[in-house]
């Protein structure tokens, strides 16, 4: 199939600031497109110009960057708007068999739904209303715009919480979710682990890393003071976390490692007993399936919308966790075995094929 993927926002900005990156090849959506290519589909990926990398790249498929307009109102970090993208879809729609667009609350999904609804999938992640402007724009979109203008497109949710949310506003929704996939070529796995846990996160307030440090310190005091905690990531709270670690006299147990590329991250994840999450606010967290395919269980609260997948398949612990849960994972290898057993079902090519099968079943029923 000839597939157009509409995904203007390639990575998550912080405080409406889009960071400059050297490459987009390590993003979730780029690797998802690779999964479609591995299933012998011809891919074109449409991206907002603000997310264009600083260095020239050669891509595995066609990648087009579109200029954003009305940027003072439609922030490219939140909801990009592009006249050029609308024109491109209108002009080129006949050259594609399928259009896959990210999010119901987005202009690219609105464009595709208006111009070619019969060949449009909206791959939807949000499970709650966006908080901007006291949720008013989000509520207007989901209650008025989506039911009128996006009702003919077919929505495939990325999680069960996303399904339960979007089903309130649209009827043409798949009950079967398709989660974020992982490029298994970038992530190996192993059963044997070191005595260490890992955090992979931006060091920003909503990620609540300080809480993880304190819980890990309680684990050191109560169970095993030889364990290590590796914190991978960068952000505004780096210095504050560094001071906290010193106050706890835990410099020999807790390390702030900064940014790591996929190859480096793979080694650290693969060697760790568990990935730790205690976030205040998140949707689908890509770090969760990345950890699982490394054979590394996840300990998280219930906030991430893909946390249900961990609980259902016994891939870790999902609750308001504490040091006792760290001990449970550290001493129970069955969680690691479950992660290894389910690894293949989280691959990009597996999940892309799953999405196409859902689509084919849908159009055969029409």
Report each predicted region and the residues it spans.
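Conserved donor-binding/catalytic core segment of Leloir-type glycosyltransferases
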Residues: 4, 156, 191-207, 211-216, ...
């Amino acid at each position: 199939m000839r597939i157009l993927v509409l995904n203007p926002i390639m990575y998550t900005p912080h405080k409406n600031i889009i960071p400059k990156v050297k490459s987009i090849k390590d993003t979730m959506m780029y690797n998802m497109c690779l999964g479609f290519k591995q299933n012998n589909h011809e891919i074109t990926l449409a991206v907002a110009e603000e997310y264009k990398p600083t260095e020239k790249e050669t891509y595995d498929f066609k990648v087009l960057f579109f200029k954003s307009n009305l940027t003072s109102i439609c922030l490219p970090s939140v909801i990009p708007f592009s006249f050029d993208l609308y024109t491109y879809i209108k002009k080129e729609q006949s050259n594609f068999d399928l259009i896959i667009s990210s999010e119901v609350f987005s202009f690219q999904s609105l464009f595709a739904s208006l111009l070619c609804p019969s060949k449009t999938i909206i791959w939807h992640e949000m499970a709650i209303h966006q908080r901007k402007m006291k949720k008013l724009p989000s509520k207007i979109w989901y209650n008025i715009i989506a039911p009128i203008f996006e009702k003919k497109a077919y929505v495939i949710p990325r999680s069960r919480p996303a399904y339960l949310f979007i089903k309130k506003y649209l009827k043409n929704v798949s009950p079967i979710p398709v989660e974020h996939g992982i490029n298994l070529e970038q992530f190996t796995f192993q059963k044997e682990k070191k005595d260490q846990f890992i955090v992979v996160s931006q060091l920003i307030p909503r990620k609540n890393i300080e809480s993880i440090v304190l819980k890990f310190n309680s684990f050191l005091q109560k169970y095993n003071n030889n364990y290590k905690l590796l914190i991978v990531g960068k952000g505004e709270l780096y210095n504050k976390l560094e001071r906290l670690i010193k106050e706890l006299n835990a410099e020999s147990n807790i390390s702030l490692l900064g940014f790591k590329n996929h190859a480096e991250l793979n080694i650290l994840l693969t060697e760790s007993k568990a990935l730790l999450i205690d976030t205040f606010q998140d949707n689908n967290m890509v770090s969760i399936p990345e950890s699982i395919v490394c054979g590394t269980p996840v300990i998280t609260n219930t906030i991430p919308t893909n946390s249900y997948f961990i609980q259902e398949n016994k891939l870790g612990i999902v609750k308001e966790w504490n040091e006792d849960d760290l001990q449970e994972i550290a001493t129970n290898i069955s969680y690691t075995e479950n992660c290894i057993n389910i690894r293949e079902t989280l691959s990009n090519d597996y999940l892309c094929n799953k999405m196409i099968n859902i689509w084919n079943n849908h159009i055969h029923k029409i």
